[in-house]
């Protein structure tokens, strides 16, 4: 925790404050079993460690990733669980410091420490938890970003539509279409042109017919 706070201090010291300065945004992790910042308690500890070092916290903000929360074992399955998360964040850090949510479902089991993003409503978090996140009245100021898979295959449009449906209170979404396995298309090898055949018939060659020689019989002599 102390090393993270020290690293943030060095970053801020190395970038002079200006009118167009960007925020340094810290995001929770799924954990992987040995990471820092996987739980809300650890984010709170980092925040307090930075404050203890006298850092300018107006230059620091936070992002929560729903798939990371789920993988780390944070409960976000419904309204009550999300209420508790929001209340704890506001009490210890302040909701004004939460500027973005990476909005993803998860293929991983709850508390698995795995980071496996999934299409909206197609994973383990489910529509109730995701709807609770995007509809929460105290998170209206937050920007939501999709990090779902299949960007190059055109899935973004579908995930945006499903997110909007959840934001409007529609929990029953249509089943996701089957994902086609990525198969590399074989390069087409141009076919060799077929040998041209001449349709003109060769002139028939008549073989000479052998002439037969017919020997004439000698004329019979008349008897006197």
Segments from the language model and where they lie:
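Active-site acidic/histidine proton-transfer and metal-coordination neighborhood
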Residues: 1-61
């Amino acid at each position: 925790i102390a090393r993270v706070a020290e690293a943030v201090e060095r970053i801020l010291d190395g970038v002079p404050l200006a009118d167009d300065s960007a925020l340094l945004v810290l995001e929770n992790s799924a954990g992987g079993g040995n990471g820092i910042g996987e739980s809300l308690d650890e984010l709170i500890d980092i925040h307090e460690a930075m404050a203890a070092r006298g850092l300018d916290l107006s230059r620091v903000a936070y992002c929560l990733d729903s798939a990371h929360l789920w993988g780390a074992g944070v409960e976000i399955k419904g309204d009550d669980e999300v209420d508790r998360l929001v209340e704890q964040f506001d009490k210890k850090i302040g909701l004004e410091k939460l500027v973005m949510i990476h909005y993803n479902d998860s293929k991983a089991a709850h508390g698995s420490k795995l980071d496996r993003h999934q299409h909206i409503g197609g994973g383990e978090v489910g529509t109730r938890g995701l709807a609770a996140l995007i509809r929460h009245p105290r998170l209206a100021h937050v920007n939501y970003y999709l990090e779902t898979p299949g960007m190059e295959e055109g899935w973004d449009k579908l995930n945006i539509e499903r997110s909007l449906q959840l934001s409007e209170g529609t929990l029953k979404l249509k089943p996701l279409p089957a994902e086609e396995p990525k198969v590399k298309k074989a390069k087409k090898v141009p076919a060799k042109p077929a040998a041209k055949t001449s349709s003109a018939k060769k002139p028939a060659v008549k073989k000479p017919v052998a002439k037969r020689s017919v020997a004439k019989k000698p004329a019979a002599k008349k008897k006197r």
